[in-house]
A protein has these predicted regions:
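Extended ligand-binding regions for polar small-molecule ligands
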Residues: 25-31, 72-81, 140, 148, ...
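Extracytoplasmic small-molecule ligand-binding "clamshell" domains
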Residues: 25-111
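Ligand-binding clefts/hinges and TM-proximal coupling segments of bilobed small-molecule sensing domains
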Residues: 25-35, 85, 162-182, 225, ...
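Bilobed "Venus flytrap"/periplasmic-binding protein-like clamshell domains
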Residues: 51-54, 64-80, 112, 133-189, ...
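A ligand-binding cleft/hinge motif common to bilobed small-molecule-binding domains
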Residues: 94-98, 111-120, 166-170, 196-231
């Protein structure tokens, strides 16, 4: 009987060991690039970002030719993990989506919110959740404390963004209550939106919360955050529809750097709340 118990115990331990090996944490395998992602072997991948979207992508203050930021660092970590050669492709934010859908850019990796409409053009790998911030001049001259108190204000929003949708929705709500509507101005890139607030042409610029907080922290005499909205939206890196190898390489790499806390370390470096990380997941529709 004792020998039977011992044998059973040994078998269970052996099976547990096999299970533990099977569930081992993912690891980087750059030497297996051609085996795992054959269409990427020998290629240099272009990573699209707007260098005026801090803290996600921005010029290094010590070296103008160097681009840094949380999304830039994530892209480097993930692509290095897979052994993929890559380079940054810099441009205005609103132009990077059509450039990616058209194949001029391989990955759009710069604070890109997921929407079903965008997923008709691009495939996503999610890694972060989002919140929206409202940037205004220091002192908040119009005393705007929420989007609901914005009737009669002028808003600057990114062209084609979820913030544009939110501003239009509130404009309609204001008018339905017989209040002045919201004047909506769209901007093609972050720098243009910031100038609208700085010059006083816009009372509020709506954009990502981390961007707003970074601008306010770096320029406290010029800007402040009027309010924030927890949106529930997810943010991801995106590729042209059907580019399965690249999509899988991004997902696999993100799983590795999330498992070993590299992503949280990058977030901490750029003062992004660690709770904004979400498990890597592919979305194609």
């Amino acid at each position: 009987m004792q020998s039977q118990i011992l044998a059973a115990t040994t078998l269970i331990a052996g099976l547990t060991g096999v299970s533990a090996v099977a569930q081992a944490a993912p690891a980087c395998e750059p030497a297996k690039l051609a085996q795992k992602y054959p269409s990427l072997a020998g290629r240099t991948i272009k990573v699209g970002a707007d260098p005026q979207t801090p803290p996600y992508a921005m010029r290094d203050g010590a070296d103008f030719n160097k681009v840094i930021g949380s999304d830039v660092d994530l892209a480097h970590a993930v692509l290095d993990c897979a052994g993929i050669k890559h380079e940054m492709f810099l441009g205005g934010w609103s132009g990077l989506m059509p450039a990616t859908a058209g194949g001029q850019v391989d990955i759009f990796w710069d604070n890109l919110y997921y929407t079903p409409e965008r997923a008709k053009q691009l495939d996503y790998v999610m890694y972060m959740q989002a919140a929206t911030g409202a940037l205004t001049q220091a002192g908040n001259p119009k005393k705007i404390t929420s989007i609901e108190t914005s009737c009669g204000a002028t808003y600057a929003v990114g062209l084609g963004t979820v913030e544009e949708v939110a501003a239009k929705k509130q404009d309609a709500a204001c008018k339905a209550e017989s209040k002045p509507g919201i004047t909506i101005m769209t901007y093609p890139d972050m720098a243009a939106g910031i100038r609208l607030v700085q010059s006083g042409r816009a009372d509020i610029m709506m954009t990502d919360l981390a961007v707003v907080d970074q601008l306010a922290a770096d320029n406290p005499k010029t800007y402040e955050r009027a309010y924030k909205i927890l949106t529930g939206f997810n943010i991801g890196a995106a590729v042209k529809k059907g580019n399965a190898d690249l999509l899988n390489a991004i997902r696999d790499g993100l799983e590795v750097i999330q498992a070993d806390s590299q992503q949280k370390a990058i977030f901490a470096k750029y003062k992004i709340d660690a709770d904004m990380q979400v498990p890597a997941a592919v979305r194609t529709e």
